[in-house]
Amino acid sequence: QNGRTTVFPEPSKNFMTGLGALPYALDTLRPLDAIIIMLGTNDLKEHTAQASVNGVGTLIRTIQTFDQLYPASVPLFGDNKPRILLLTPIEIGENVAEWDTLYGKGEESRKFPALMKGLCEWLDVEMMNTQEIVQPSKVDGIHMMPEEHRKLALAVRDRLLGLVKA
């Protein structure tokens, strides 16, 4: 779903947070082999990259403690081996329209890889720096063009296969 934040509700869409959707999605989809998280860009509309990464940390800790928070006959991860892959948000380009709430947030978006690396080391989860793999569209500076989606999908596939086989 486009427009989702990590944990910060937007006044016009207070239901569009990752934290709000996560418990229902996890409980409905269990058991899982792995979980991929890629959130953060929309947080920059009103918050810093550090605040966004703190929100991602809340999501990861929710996943890591899900079975204790919401016990069920089927564990969240079928083999009780949590596999979480965090993808950094892509860089926000320089050609974002002045009217867009993400205008001028490129520098802040480039902080995600270093901040998320520290978080992932602390919480013992895998990370992939998408900013080394794909570029934002020249059209809006925020989204990816189809060829960039393909590059990212192939990179995630390879990383995920290695993670699940481990």
Descriptions of predicted regions:
Residues 1-72, 77-78, 83, 107-114, ...:
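Conserved SGNH/GDSL esterase-like catalytic core that processes O-acyl groups on lipids
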Residues 2-4, 93-97, 135-138:
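Short acidic/His/Gly/Ser-rich catalytic and metal-binding motifs that mark active-site loops
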Residues 26-30, 116-120, 161-164:
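Extended, charge-rich low-complexity interaction segments
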Residues 36, 85-87, 126-128:
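Hydrophobic/aromatic beta-strand patches that form the interior of the parallel beta-sheet core
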Residues 39-40, 88-90, 131-132:
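Short, well-ordered beta-to-alpha junction loops that form the rim of enzyme active sites
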Residues 58, 62-66, 115-123, 155, ...:
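Alpha-helical structural signal in soluble globular domains
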Residues 70-71, 92-130:
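Substrate-gating cap/lid alpha-helix
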Residues 126, 137-166:
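Histidine-centered active-site loop/cap adjacent to the catalytic His
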